[in-house]
């Protein structure tokens, strides 16, 4: 009997082909654990600097609670990378680790998408999406870099291997060619995300960012072997769908009721919106996002919306915004200069806009309920965040000390806010006490009689921009150095001007020009009061350019005071 020939079956894939599947699941589990830990941290963690702890310990606790990217990304990637190098040889089985880089970048996307949900119902009570802006920015960069390294290392590996044709591996194989396209897109995104490029043309960055992210999510499953369709593609598509639904369900059309602007003096404007566009209650310092396009317009999805802090309270009859409209034009120019600026965005009465949603501020709940010793420091258009907070605490009977400090460049900005208070009938005299006051510091020169000489001093370039519409590059010119804060003991012979210019709030609002501003001097009573009350009752709010936020933060760290700041960075 003739023996049948021996048939040998050769495995289609090597023994390492499925080596990274479990690692992908591990990354997903770590992401889930991180989210649970984050929720517990915000629910039960302590952001208050303990008076008995060291400054270093307080700093670490605050950075951890504040979702500092360096701390949180360090913890996350330490956990993710623990089993990265395991079992397989780095020299003879390097392909395993090159593929692992790609799977790692894709497996981290669900976490990134989840943290940027607006609103995020899982973290809504103790977090706002603005808390995650710095984290999201650096997390996204790391994910894209990991994915790009995956592609670069494979190209290098094939290029130096004499037994492999780079053209055949990279171009002729459909799976790898798709990966090559992804690498090119990711590289373009990284270039657009460089600080100067992003600030020069934020619209371009935003469009590229969104399109590349969608392409990365949808094309990677075509490229990846073994597949990542379940659970990663399913999760990513589900989260993308939720993002889309949020921008549809909560959006509504709106028109501007009134706009008070005087471009010959200042770019600070007061805009009034219908009260009906927001719920019956919203927290003081909340903000809204507005798009100039309707939901059916593709530009609604491609271009960024514009965030604005709400200057009014929930009980007011309208929604008021006090904003600076971005412009390259100097005060005194025609309005056409503002409109012709491609970077500018301004609200017109004759147009219809889309309100995407409203969002709470990054203010702890216990601050509203327990705060009795309050200081609020703002610069420029940061008044839109500070004013509703001041009004909220001013109306509370148990508040023992309340002071708001507003630093501005010229008197016209104060006039506009004063007009807003008068128009809305907002007077504070009925509940006035010696421990409740507003101080306005003006860095430019003016006379109380004419109010026309608005000569701004030389300023420091903060070299920064802001995402939130209540701030923009106009506020970069507002530097603490204008107020001589670094030279508190200097014998400055510059005359100081101080007066209370209003009848309605004359005893409450004090306006000072060329005043040597020092935070410690202005907050002496606040600091004295903080030593006599419970630590949870003392809070300092800050909203303005980076130099002001840094000064306020340092003061709070030194004095062991609760600190809340509103920062919106590109």
Swiss-Prot record:
The keyword Oxidoreductase applies. GO terms for biological process: reductive iron assimilation. CDD domains: NOX_Duox_like_FAD_NADP. Its EC number is 1.16.1.-. It is found in: Membrane. Residues 101-219 form the Ferric oxidoreductase domain. The keyword Transport applies. One of its GO terms (molecular function) is ferric-chelate reductase activity. One of its GO terms (cellular component) is plasma membrane. Residues 250-388 form the FAD-binding FR-type domain. It is a multi-pass membrane protein. The chain crosses the membrane at residues 21-41, 70-90, 101-118, 142-162, 177-197, 204-224, 230-250. Keywords: Electron transport, FAD, Flavoprotein, Ion transport, Membrane, NADP, Oxidoreductase, Transmembrane, Transmembrane helix, Transport. Its main location: membrane. Signal peptide: none annotated. Residues 481-505 have a biased composition (Polar residues). It is an enzyme of class 1 (oxidoreductase). It holds the Pfam family NAD_binding_6. Residues 481-507 are annotated as: Disordered. Coiled coil: none annotated. Belongs to the ferric reductase (FRE) family. AIM14 subfamily. Interacts with ribosomes. Probable cell surface metalloreductase. May be involved in iron or copper homeostasis. This is Probable metalloreductase AIM14. It comes from Saccharomyces cerevisiae (strain YJM789) (Baker's yeast). The gene is AIM14.
